[in-house]
């Protein structure tokens, strides 16, 4: 079964302004991915960091909507000392602390793909793919690739 880690940018995307084509298409891709996780075709992995980052969303209505998407997860990863240590290594690649923790959790969970809509993160890791144990991709690009196979 395909194991998928969505960062909080992805989980927020369906609630962003969908009048922009990119946002609308990414939202549709994310909702399709979540539907496949709900149907049991794929497995959604979340982490303690996912919940901590969602807790920082200032708008309570949005926070509850994003939190509701977590209900379909199949695996929950707690942060331990090995994840913290790995996150510090990932931060040396100029990756922000929360992003590094997400990536370290995804690596420890042995996910098949880590999805994010964060272009800055994707650019940083594209220069350092060799140093990571998980593939990071934009959800629209990845879903298009998977569907066309």
Segments the model singles out, each with a brief description of its role:
Residues 95-104, 111:
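Mid-chain, well-packed structural core segment of small domains
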Residues 30-35, 66-67, 103:
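Short amphipathic alpha-helical segments and helix-helix/interface helices
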Residues 5-58, 76, 139-145:
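PIN/NYN-family metal-dependent endoribonuclease catalytic core
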Residues 3, 11, 17-27, 92, ...:
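Acidic, PIN/NYN-like endoribonuclease modules and their adjacent C-terminal/linker elements
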Residues 56-72:
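Short, electropositive alpha-helical surface patch
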Residues 10, 50, 83, 101-102, ...:
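Alpha-helix capping/helix-boundary segments
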Residues 78, 97-100, 116:
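Short beta-strand scaffold positions
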